[in-house]
Amino acid sequence: WGIYIMKSYQLTIPSNIYAGKSSIDNLVNIITKENVKSILVFTDKGVRAVGLCDKVEEICKTVQYRIIDDLTAEPAVADVERVINEVGSTKYDLIIGVGGGSVMDASKLASIILGADYSLRDLLKDSSIAKKQIKTVMIPTTCGTGSEATCNAIVAIPEQESKQGIVNNCMIPDYVILDVNMIAKLPPKIIAATGVDALAHVVECFTSKKATILSDTYAKEGACKIFHNIRKAYNNADDLEAKAEMMLGAFYGGVAITGSGTTAVHALSYPLGGKYHIAHGVSNAILFAYVMEFNKDGCKDRLAMLCDAVYPELAVKSIDEKADYIIKEIADIVKDTNIPTSL
């Protein structure tokens, strides 16, 4: 760790984090604390259909609120622009995102575009001009994207058959609520896809050349939680402890992204998903083990360090054996959770 001591680092994370069963009740206090009079809620029809937005709507009834629930699964530039135009000049004091990565990304984009003198297309050219316009609360309903912790938002660009990230620290949410009740009934298929996405976050962040002692701390702890709990959460719908660990692991992965960024898996995943319209977690899963194997010689020391953190019982193994073990575990997790491994 000596190399870290001689460098300086910055890590920006959400300033208010509520975690644990029924932590969504804290939304009442947030609304009061921020003196909120009007709220814009982003979600999707699936989340509303299964009742995951009911509690949020009940709490929001104490003030004026509007719900946007017709976002596409992988929002394109035109989708986000449509929503921004629909909202128009209406003033909101708070934006709440209730859903997976796409919903939260759209929420974060709205928080920096509504009321601003620049557009989404301006941000695609230069995201450094962004400024927070409206405070945000992120309430994830999956255990994988980590969007509730990041300064990133991804939009699809169909004409280029790709996706692009907008990155600016002003998009980091002001409040995060990690309530396991929100993922208690999450289908195994979604646990698998979003969980492997979270696993890619922590592994890529830890092996990134931009890794720091701060991002490492979150990436290692996130890796421990995800490697040890993703199969449990996938196989046992009643294992709320495993799901809570997955939710926290995904959040840690998001924090790690802010500190070091992802690497080749995600870089290849965006055009794959953009061209073939594959869910983000699935496109990562298709590539994950193969990319890590291809790059192993350049990051095997870091993979071995990660293995030491996640599987301390393998401490006597060689660096190569530890690196191989992590890569094999990645492949086995994808197989064990029945994620497609080809187009």
Annotate each language-model stretch with its function:
Residues G144, F251-N284:
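Glycine-rich phosphate/pyrophosphate-binding beta-alpha loops
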Residues N152-S260:
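Carboxylate- and glycine-rich phosphate/diphosphate-binding segment that chelates Mg2+/Mn2+
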Residues M6-L94, L343:
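ATP/NTP phosphate-donor binding region
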Residues W1-I5:
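Short, Lys/Arg-enriched N-terminal segments with co-localized hydrophobic residues
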Residues K275-S342:
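Gly/Pro-rich interdomain helix-loop hinge
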